[in-house]
Structures are given as structure tokens and as C-alpha cells.
């Protein structure tokens, strides 16, 4: 089906949740999880609010998924230097935004002094050599890669949970250990689609 190739799969429920959450979310949520020290869990609440989905972790940290029609909305030109999937971290003193190109932008400008200390230590998400080195080192050490299957699994489950909150248009509460929605048969029924006989999950 030509509608499913060359980018045509975007916006299709079967492949992209109809809201690009499974596309852009897959590229960005793992970075948010890592920054929150939450690689082994995921948000516990997902609430659609206008054009965003507000997620909350058990530790109180909020994650806001931006579901604008264009991935980055109407942002200034500097966003292009951050790559295709920028993520913004907002704190008490301002914000830091970075993306898969390794570029970093901060506000207020006074944070740029601290940025100089960080930029020498960072590793770009698009740096193939860094990813390859991490993989080869882990082959030798038998250790886990930085973006291992469990890290990515939790990120993807969070994307799917957010997509279901979006589709149902209501707040969902997720038990991250059981990986099921609390007290919500309808949402739980959407976690896995019925398979054609004789296939089962």
C-alpha cells in the first residue's frame, strides 16, 4: 500500500497512533526518561490537555508531550540547529533545549556560562562512532548498551499510553510494574489488538 511508505504511514493509527506520538515520541522520550533517572519505569499518569499530553512520574516530575500539527510548532530558527527531535528541560532558573544533533540552547542567556562546562562532556545522539563504540564495548564487557532494549521498551510503552489517553480523550493512570491501566477496562482492552485465529499473544 503506497499510503504506508515514504512517510505515508505517519498519521495512520496502525503505525503512528494517529498523532505522531509513536514516531516523534520514540525519538525523544528515551532522552526524557534518562534525564529523569527513569530508564526502568515510565510516567504513571497521562492527561490530554488541548494540543498536549501532560504526563506525571511517580516522583512528581511532569513530562509534556507537544502534539502540534507540525512537530515543533512555531519556534524560532535556532531550533533547526538542535536536530529533528528537540527536547526542552524546564527548571527553576530557566530552560535547556537539546536534540539529536547535539546542539544546545538555553534561556536565560546567563546559563550559557554553565553551558561551556557541559558541552565538552556531552555525546551527540547522531554521533554514530559514539553509538558504535558503546555497542562494541558492551559486546566485550557483556554490559548493557546505553539505549538497551529495556530502556527503549519503557519509552515505547509510555508513548503508547499517551496515545491511548489522546484517543480516549481522558486521563489514564498506569501501573508501571504491571504495565496496565488502573481501574480502566476500556484502556486495558486497547493495549493489545485481537489477533487473527490461530495467532495469540
State each model region's role.
Residues 14-22, 75, 117-125, 139-152:
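Active-site rim elements
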Residues 31-37, 134-138, 164:
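Residue-level signal for well-ordered alpha-helical scaffold segments within enzymatic catalytic domains
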Amino acid at each position: 500500500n503506497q499510503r504506508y511508505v515514504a512517510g505515508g504511514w505517519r498519521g495512520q493509527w496502525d503505525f503512528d497512533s494517529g498523532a505522531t506520538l509513536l514516531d516523534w515520541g520514540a525519538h525523544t522520550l528515551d532522552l526524557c526518561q534518562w534525564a529523569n533517572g527513569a530508564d526502568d519505569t515510565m510516567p504513571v499518569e497521562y492527561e490530554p490537555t488541548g494540543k498536549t499530553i501532560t504526563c506525571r512520574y511517580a516522583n512528581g516530575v511532569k513530562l509534556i508531550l507537544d502534539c502540534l500539527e507540525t512537530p515543533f510548532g512555531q519556534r524560532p530558527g535556532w531550533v533547526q540547529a538542535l536536530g529533528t527531535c528537540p527536547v526542552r528541560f524546564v527548571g527553576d532558573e530557566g530552560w535547556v533545549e537539546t536534540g539529536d544533533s547535539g546542539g544546545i540552547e538555553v534561556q536565560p542567556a546567563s546559563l550559557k556560562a554553565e553551558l561551556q562546562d557541559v558541552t565538552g562532556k556531552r555525546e551527540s545522539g547522531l554521533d554514530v562512532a559514539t553509538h558504535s563504540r558503546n555497542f562494541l564495548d558492551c559486546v566485550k564487557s557483556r554490559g548493557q548498551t546505553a539505549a538497551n532494549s529495556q530502556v527503549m521498551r519503557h519509552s515505547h510503552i509510555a508513548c503508547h499510553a499517551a496515545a491511548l489517553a489522546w484517543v480516549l480523550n481522558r486521563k489514564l493512570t498506569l501501573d508501571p510494574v504491571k504495565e496496565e491501566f488502573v481501574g480502566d477496562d476500556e484502556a486495558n482492552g486497547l493495549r493489545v489488538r485481537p489477533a487473527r485465529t490461530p495467532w495469540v499473544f
